[in-house]
Design a protein with these regions (language model features):
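Membrane-cytosol interface segments
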Residues: 1-133, 389-418
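Histidine- and acidic-residue-rich, metal-dependent catalytic cores
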Residues: 103-418
Length: 418
């Protein structure tokens, strides 16, 4: 029987069906779990959760109060039985989400990235232990990421790129989720398709939890045998998602086929061209972009613009051209965080792409003079603005100019949250 109880009544051995809290504020990945020890109760307390639903058929019931000699009997604790599902509030249509500046979104995006990392780590840990995941509870996280991307795609996508090598497996999933959402919007997909594509991005690499950690995190080149083990992750993930709750066809498809290539040289099935779905083609582009822009145990990431150049060179055999071109439009020719050289001789970092304006004319924060070879007071330039004569002449490598920590020029106050 389901029963709603107060925090003070929670005890070891109870089976919690659901905490009375939003999924984002819950300290647990799984909605339902057994209270195994005092540490579990302490986590609930620290999260500030005051009520929970328990299932007395799967765990112990509340303690009945000891009845002392008293003039009046003690009333039994009232039981509340769930008879109807809770009403779900429909999310705001993405077309109605108000777009904001990079500065306005960075703080919110940083919090979402932090929460996402914890949630994905918990979800993937459950998968590594062989437990079935409840993927439908990831949808509120997808909604948070989607809302941020709709407000300003550069903020969360840029922040997710700044993962460490140790965080890669988990933050890669968050980044691909955000990239899939931005690409879905660019392709004109419906809100529901955008959500499903985002969920697919979040779950696409769940199968890597079946790969031994020493192979997954190996700093050197993989042996042929080790690479064969890694190549099994799409199939392993597909099997995991078949057992999960709330996973639709799109997530299953992307999980299994995001390493397929349009020329048939991909894996696991060697599909080509139209044998590969739109969503799997999207997953392939987003997966590769985040992989090559991220620091890995065995290599440093490339800058965003350099990564797009490399992908363009590979695109004929690897990617669907229509999808790849839409991807470029979704993040810009010079994505946020790209170091560029201006016609004036100044170096700057791209801080924002502007909706409805030329991809060649983003906002840039100039901070270094190549003429005097010295740092200059940072100045924000809207290259699309009236009277602005400066323009981008090249993308640059920070190491060429011995520049350190250029990300601070676009992160601003959010740098402390990364």
């Amino acid at each position: 029987m389901l029963k709603k109880i107060q925090f003070e009544q929670i005890r070891q051995g109870m089976y919690v069906k659901e905490l009375c809290a939003s999924w984002m504020s819950s300290p647990f990945w799984q909605k339902s779990f057994l209270v195994e020890d005092a540490a579990t109760i302490e986590k609930i307390q620290k999260a500030g959760i005051r009520e929970a639903w328990i299932d007395t058929a799967k765990g112990v019931d509340v303690l009945e109060p000891e009845i002392q000699a008293a003039p009046e009997p003690i009333a039994p604790i009232k039981e509340v039985v769930v008879e109807t599902p809770k009403q779900v509030v429909a999310p705001v249509p993405y077309s109605q989400v108000v777009q904001v500046s990079m500065d306005a979104e960075l703080g919110r995006a940083a919090k979402i990235v932090g929460t996402s990392k914890t949630a994905v780590f918990s979800m993937f840990s459950e998968a590594r232990m062989g437990n079935a995941i409840e993927a439908e509870h990831a949808m509120p996280l997808v909604e948070e990421i989607a809302s941020s991307v709709m407000r300003n795609p550069g903020a969360l996508i840029g922040l997710a790129r700044l993962k460490t090598a140790d965080d890669y497996t988990y933050m890669h999933s968050v980044a691909v989720c955000a990239l899939m959402i931005a690409l879905s919007r660019q392709l004109g997909l419906s809100d529901e398709e955008v959500r499903e594509a985002g969920l697919a991005g979040l779950l696409h690499d769940i199968g890597k939890m079946a790969v031994p950690p020493e192979i997954l995190n190996k700093p050197g080149r993989l042996t042929e045998e080790e690479f064969t083990s890694v190549k099994e992750h799409p199939g392993a993930g597909y099997e995991m998602l078949l057992e999960a709750k709330g996973v639709g066809k799109i997530a299953l498809d992307v999980c299994l086929h995001h390493h397929e290539k349009v020329d048939g040289s991909g894996y696991p099935k060697g599909l080509n061209g139209e044998q590969i779905s739109l969503y799997a083609k999207m997953g392939a582009v987003c997966d590769v972009y985040d992989a090559i822009t991220s620091n890995r145990p065995y290599k440093a990431g490339w800058c965003p613009a350099e990564s797009l150049k490399k992908m363009a060179e590979w695109s004929k055999g690897h990617f669907d051209d229509r999808v790849f071109q839409a991807f470029i439009r979704s993040i810009g020719i010079y994505p946020v965080g790209t170091l560029v050289k201006l016609h004036s001789g100044r170096l700057g970092v791209v801080v924002e792409q502007q909706v409805g304006k030329s991809l060649l004319l983003p906002k840039v924060r100039a901070f270094f003079s190549t003429k005097s070879m010295a740092y200059i007071p940072p100045v924000l330039l809207d290259l699309s603005g009236p009277g602005i004569q400066d323009k981008i002449v090249s993308r640059e490598d920070a190491s060429t100019w011995d520049l350190k920590d250029i990300n601070r020029y676009w992160l601003g106050d959010a740098v402390d949250s990364v």
